[in-house]
A protein has these predicted regions:
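Donor nucleotide-sugar binding loop of glycosyltransferases
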Residues: 19-22, 47, 105
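Short beta-strand/loop segment that forms part of the nucleotide-sugar
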Residues: 27, 37-47, 68-69, 98
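Short, well-formed alpha-helical segments that are part of the catalytic scaffolds
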Residues: 19-32
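Short beta-strand-to-loop acidic/aromatic patch adjacent to the donor-nucleotide binding site
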Residues: 92-103
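Acceptor/aglycone-binding surface of glycosyltransferases and processive sugar-polymer synthases
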Residues: 68-89, 106-152
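Cell-envelope/extracellular polymer assembly enzymes that use nucleotide-activated donors
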Residues: 9-11, 39
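A conserved acidic beta->alpha catalytic loop
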Residues: 44-53, 102
Length: 152
């Protein structure tokens, strides 16, 4: 597939807060689905459960993983903004955003990167035809779906 070209340097940005149970598995899944020049950037909001320390250990073992430790929890939106800025500073040619709770499937990364060949922006959504919420209880889906509609 074309997404594995040497010039492509995608960075996957993942904010974390109390994700110690997921962070190592998510890192492995993301790295498995990245092309050769890809990297993973975690943004930890000073998680009290030790998520940041786990990420530090992952960084020590794999140079493709980086972390931005933030002093306090400032919200998901600000975490993504900081992550996008850091990804661009690190030389990203493409930025992929994902959550650490596996609500976004890392197996979709190659498909999204391949889609960039025909578009400037690629958006994956669980609310479009063919989209889905795997493993979500009804209450979480309901709040997410109707909360998004209310905000719009």
């Amino acid at each position: 597939m074309w997404y594995n070209l040497p010039h492509m340097k995608p960075i996957v940005v993942i904010p974390t807060y109390n994700e110690r149970e997921n962070v190592a598995a998510m890192a492995a899944a993301v790295l498995e689905n990245l092309p050769a020049g890809g990297r993973l950037l975690f943004l930890d909001d000073n998680s009290p459960d030790g998520t940041g320390a786990i990420i530090d250990g992952l960084c020590a073992r794999d140079p493709r993983i980086a972390v931005l430790h933030r002093v306090k929890k400032e919200g998901l939106g600000r975490a993504y903004v900081a992550g996008f800025a850091r990804a661009l500073a690190l030389g990203a040619t493409h930025v992929v955003e994902m959550d650490c709770d596996f609500s976004h499937d890392p197996k979709d990364i190659p498909r999204m990167l391949a889609a960039v060949a025909d578009a400037d922006v690629v958006v994956g959504s669980r609310y479009v035809k063919g989209g889905r919420c795997v493993g979500w209880p009804f209450r979480r889906w309901f709040v997410s779906f109707f909360g998004g509609r209310f905000i719009r």
